[in-house]
Amino acid sequence: MLSFARRFQTIAAPTGQRAINPENPMRLIKLPIAALILAFAQSPHAANAENKTPEADAGKALSAFFDAEWDYEMQQNPAQASSLGDRRWNDRWSDRSLEAIQKDEHHTTDALARFTKIDRTRLSAADQLNYDLFKKDLEMEIDGFKFRTYLMPISQRGGLQTLDELGDRLRFETVKDYEDWIARLRSLPALFEQEMTLMREGAKTHVMWPKIVLSRIPAQIDKQIVSKPEESPFFKPFKKFPDSIPNGDRERLTKSASEAIASGVLPSFQKLKRYFVEEYLPAAFDQVGVWQMPQGAEFYAYLARRHTTTTLTPQQIHEKGLSEVARIHAEMQAVMEKVGFKGTLPEFFTKLRTDPQFFYKTPEELLEAYRALAKRIDPNLVKVFKTLPRTPYGVTPIPDKIAPDTTTAYYSQPAADGSRAGVYFVNLYKPETRPKWEMMALSLHESVPGHHLQIALAQELGDIPKFRRYGGYTAFVEGWGLYAESLGQEMGLYDDPYSRFGQLTYEMWRAVRLVVDTGMHHMKWDRQRAIDFFMANAPKAENDIVNEIDRYISMPGQALAYKIGELKIKELRDRARAALGERFELREFHDAVLLSGAVPLDVLERNIDAWIATRKAASTSTPATAKP
């Protein structure tokens, strides 16, 4: 899972399609956004575009437009800009008023008409792709306006109660860095009022998450309500200053931060807690699917299209999931027999969940083991990859305050300016529920060759617009992550039957998602039925399974992307191998998949078909040796 769609649902959320606004987890930062288009449309470049300029001029105009758009989007989403290393708006939050949101929507709708006046035929092939992706994203965003997802800005995976985590993503090197953070602390009460206004409207119109997941939030808010300002998570940057900041400034900054927290931050959390417990939570649904929201069936079908980048219906996805579950069961059975277990598959699951030999005793041991796995994986990448990213990554624990309520692990992308490496966050809560046999598959997914390799490579691509370099499509990003787990076999990393079973467990986990996500949100399953199906088909710990099901409840449709994307990548790999025979080279195939950045699955298919045609046409004196 990804942090910029992942935990700006706890400040950078599980992978969604683009980055997610930390002040509103459900709003995907479209990076192609309306008012930016307006900014371009009002610029000199717009006239050239609308007058159908020659290819060179049209390309320059489009490039200038994308640059202007990126800047505007960052200005509208300051926390996102800060997370990417852009400090220009470090002293503020987004405007989350209803008026600002409605203005944005109006601009987006108006802007699409202006954007389509750009003559696509005058653009190069590469810019035509950029144009098409931008236009498709914009149309998808407009299609989603009717669902008013901005009215549910808080879930157990993030919202106001996790905004302090932005501080962990920032550099505090100068006096201004600290002053900017203090300015943000002082403006938090206004942000809380705006978000609570949205929540009130959501409760009134039944656009909110179900009670079962919202009930986790009061305990999270409680961790923000401390007796002294110095105990607040927002005070953390002031506990250690760089040597370059004089003592006098340190004292002044520390005093200002304490005053801002005492006078504004703590009262805001107290007010949020009262409203949440007394009014918001009681208004929530008891059932779990989005089918009960206004236009719920249409909303879920929209989310399925958005996250999978396909036209598959929820029913088709459900049936595909059942088929995959049956296939993977057969492979699990074979591994169980290989280790000599005498019993049924459910009994083997119980052994894997409970046998002490499969677990570390302490969080410290678990973290050390994750870091050792990373060191083992890295040198094996060259076996299956030709191009590797320059940006490093680290392995870090998930913050204690959210670990009980979140998933097994997630990834947070590097800063755009290179000031922060990628981070593979691992959950150390209850190590007795985190089996050794799952750790390799999990690490391959979240770090390398999964999310870190794919996202860091995309960020290092210099020839695509920023909205593509730092954005993504759930089906591509998470499909790649799941596909990366299977590469452990080519890399020689599944060197015992249990780690291989762990890989199958993780594949089964994603197949189960197709069934339970559509089950709850389309077929009206209750939560317990989803938990029971998961428990019966995958040996993950019950605590993990419950957290996963609750994640699907508050992130409808996102979990569909993993298996759908992985199946497409494997289909294209098989197609390429069949077409190229001895000329098929796995490392070059991976370049063909990754070096255009994240794209919708239909675009990926066109890219690979073009790569196959080019490879077939190329003359070579020495045929390549076929690789698996």
Q: Across the structure, where does each feature detected by a protein language model lie?
A:
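Bacterial N-terminal signal peptides that target proteins for export
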Residues: 5-11, 19-33
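Intrinsically disordered, low-complexity serine/threonine-rich segments
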Residues: 6-7, 11-13, 43-46, 624
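Long alpha-helical scaffolds
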Residues: 13, 28, 405-409
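Bacterial N-terminal signal peptides
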Residues: 30-43
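N-terminal maturation segment of proteins
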Residues: 47-628
